[in-house]
């Protein structure tokens, strides 16, 4: 069972996004992956999974909880404009360039 608790929600109209701080509790389950966290947040907020940038996740020592920060963009163009390349790659919005 996974439970999402939004601890802080802020609209940022200038950057065309919502910013969320959350606690994700997962009793008797493995630690959710970044993709699974995006799916949980998308379902909870009614957003498209592709527009969610999971910036940070910190698992609390000795607990089955993650404290995290994520951004939900209104459109992909805004995410591509405001997010650094490494975040876009990490969240699957951009492919890593081969050297």
Curated annotation (Swiss-Prot):
Gene3D superfamilies: 3.30.70.330. Keywords: Ribonucleoprotein, Ribosomal protein. Pfam families: Ribosomal_S24e. Belongs to the eukaryotic ribosomal protein eS24 family. InterPro entries: Nucleotide-bd_a/b_plait_sf, Ribosomal_eS24, Ribosomal_eS24_CS, Ribosomal_uL23/eL15/eS24_sf. This is Small ribosomal subunit protein eS24. One of its GO terms (cellular component) is ribonucleoprotein complex. The keyword Ribosomal protein applies. The keyword Ribonucleoprotein applies. It comes from Thermoplasma volcanium (strain ATCC 51530 / DSM 4299 / JCM 9571 / NBRC 15438 / GSS1). One of its GO terms (molecular function) is structural constituent of ribosome. GO terms for biological process: translation.
């Amino acid at each position: 069972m996974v439970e999402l608790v939004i601890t802080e929600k802020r609209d940022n109209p200038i950057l065309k996004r919502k910013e969320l701080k959350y606690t994700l509790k997962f009793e008797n389950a493995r630690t959710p992956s970044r993709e699974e966290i995006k799916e949980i947040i998308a379902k909870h907020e009614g957003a498209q999974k592709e527009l969610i940038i999971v910036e940070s996740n910190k698992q609390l020592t000795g607990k089955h909880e993650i404290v995290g920060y994520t951004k939900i963009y209104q459109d992909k163009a805004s995410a591509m404009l405001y997010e650094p390349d490494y975040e876009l790659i990490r969240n699957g919005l951009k492919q890593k360039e081969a050297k």
